[in-house]
Amino acid sequence: MEVRNNNKVNLCFSFDNLRNELSRPYGILFINNKIFLEFISKSIQRGSRIITVGDYVSRVLEENGIVPFLEVIDGKTKRTITQNRAITRNKEYKVTNEAGKIRFEIFEIMENILKDREGGVVFVDGEEDLLVIPVTLSANHGDIVIYGQPNAGAVVIIVNEMIRWRVRDILEKAIVKEC
């Protein structure tokens, strides 16, 4: 086990063994943008915070006048570099996360960011896809977590104890490896 000089353990959860399970949507799959945007607008009116994981879903909301409380992006859509963002935020964070993994430290980072009342943008050097897991575990009850389902639409997770249980179940099946 490698310990960095900043006293953080260099371990990751690896999900290679869970590709099939993770390819299914873990929330409500919206295939119609109009219905999706109406749902998000009503959720905001009810006081839910909107958290996006992925460049495409973040951009769709922004283009429709909805600025998420927190965006987790890596600058790519389907592994292709996306255009620069039009909206800047007061708080911007940078993290590193390898494809197909979640670094242990990301859980604490997301928890701290989601405690902040201002939200912001998390720029991921690497890949953000699996960061739905720590975001969902750290989000408040009733928060809305959105991620893209490639070639299908947007998946909306309404955070509650049942979904946290499902996410913990996935996490327990992951393999711990050195990053």
UniProtKB/Swiss-Prot annotation:
Pathway(s) it belongs to: Cofactor biosynthesis; coenzyme A biosynthesis
Catalysed reactions, semicolon-separated: 3'-dephospho-CoA + GTP = GDP + CoA + H(+)
Keyword field contains Transmembrane: no
GO molecular function, one term: GTP binding
Keyword Nucleotide-binding: yes
E.C. designation(s): 2.7.1.237
Span of the signal peptide: none
Chain residues that bind GTP: 55, 57, 74, 76, 128
Alphabetical GO biological process terms: coenzyme A biosynthetic process
Keywords: Coenzyme A biosynthesis, GTP-binding, Kinase, Nucleotide-binding, Transferase
Chain's role: Catalyzes the GTP-dependent phosphorylation of the 3'-hydroxyl group of dephosphocoenzyme A to form coenzyme A (CoA).
UniProt similarity note: Belongs to the GTP-dependent DPCK family.
Protein name: GTP-dependent dephospho-CoA kinase
Record organism: Saccharolobus solfataricus (strain ATCC 35092 / DSM 1617 / JCM 11322 / P2)
Phylogenetic classification of the source organism: Archaea, Thermoproteota, Thermoprotei, Sulfolobales, Sulfolobaceae
